[in-house]
Amino acid sequence: MLSYDYENALKVGEISLEDINKVDFANAYSNLMEKLDNGVVGFRDVIYDENLDKYKSLNGYENVVVIGMGGSILGTMAIYYAISPFNNNAYFIDNSDPEKTLSILKKVDLNESIIYIISKSGNTLETLVNYYLIKKRIEKLNSFKGKLVFITNGGKLKREAEKNNYDIFSIPENVPGRFSVFTAVGLAPLYSLGVDISKILEGAREMDKICQNEDILKNPALLNGVIHYLYDKRGKDISVIMSYVESLKYFGDWYKQLIGESLGKNKHGITPLLSIGAKDQHSLLQLYMDGKKDKIITFMVAKKYRLDEEIEFEDINDEKISCRYSDIIRSQQKATEIALTNNGVPNVRITLDEINEMAMGALLYMYEMQVGFMGELYNINAYNQPAVEEEKKICWRLIKQ
Ligand code: PA5
């Protein structure tokens, strides 16, 4: 599924195995396990929910429209774009930008669509307004042959769904939005999009077994968490995901939310950034290598690309070279890794065997566990988002003025 390499995080010489062992990670580990065992937080329990039959009626629509914000949509996008980067019957309305939303609504035939309205609170402004845009269009149709599905626990949207007898799925209360991709929030729309959700859960469960390991060197979530924690303490508080698989771009967006919203509290926090290799070697690499030394890089690579071929070309000295096309991007990644390490920039590497459902389930779950461990290391509540809630309240006030 995936492997994790951390040798370059030690090679640059700023932290050692001894430093790692000095961190009280055993306490972080047992605190998180206690929270998961006692149901204080439920993101582990949901990967063991085997009842996927409940999604069976959600198949067979030409288009899948998903409306939601933040944790209610980013995980779905991360998995969908990784698994099916070249399909285009998916429409994600994840903002209130009129040009984006209205151009999607112009294009999509609602009669041929299953439309998901996803909001745990049921009161998020953007989601509510985007639903009303859809509602207005549906009301104008003579008869609506598509399907509306609500994934919500309450608020205005749940009342709307109940009033109109729409399908409703709920989200376990102890699973916060950004940890909810393995609930109906992610699984229902992914199922409609043809993604094998049982394999996603299988990948997450395999990773869960690995993350139960108390030996930090055998537990990538714990180890990556401690490495990022130690570098943060040394002033390297910007965590860059540099993916050499472009279809992981939306995984990067999900990562930014998970890290930013979970750990950015009480003056703590790591700033997550996303870069795409090899493109960003021609832009941001200058900053990463030669600029302020405040970053730790996570390379994301694939052992096997789903499309590949033999190529032949001539180099600048007219010498013939033949190789696989994927050897080019692999060499670029390796070269960047060596150069960064030589310049004292710590980096780790996650290698996915192939981009598929199992690997994506494992990857997202690994990060959920990592952030859970990191919340314990910083002694903060990784599962709330008071600052986000504060803005939501102010915005409701402004809109009503
Ligand atoms: O992680 C979170 O809790 C947030 O990002 C929410 O997912 C986001 O604000 C949307 O909230 P809701 O699902 O209530 O519409």
UniProtKB/Swiss-Prot annotation:
Pathway: Carbohydrate biosynthesis; gluconeogenesis; Carbohydrate degradation; glycolysis; D-glyceraldehyde 3-phosphate and glycerone phosphate from D-glucose: step 2/4. Optimum pH is 6.3. 50% remaining activity is observed at pH 5.3 and pH 7. It is an enzyme of class 5 (isomerase). InterPro entries: G6P_Isomerase, GPI, Phosphoglucose_isomerase_CS, SIS_dom_sf, SIS_PGI_1, SIS_PGI_2. The keyword Cytoplasm applies. GO terms for cellular component: cytosol. GO terms for molecular function: carbohydrate derivative binding; glucose-6-phosphate isomerase activity; monosaccharide binding. Homodimer. Belongs to the GPI family. Catalyzes the isomerization of glucose-6-P to fructose-6-P. This is Glucose-6-phosphate isomerase. It comes from Methanocaldococcus jannaschii (strain ATCC 43067 / DSM 2661 / JAL-1 / JCM 10045 / NBRC 100440) (Methanococcus jannaschii). The gene is pgi.
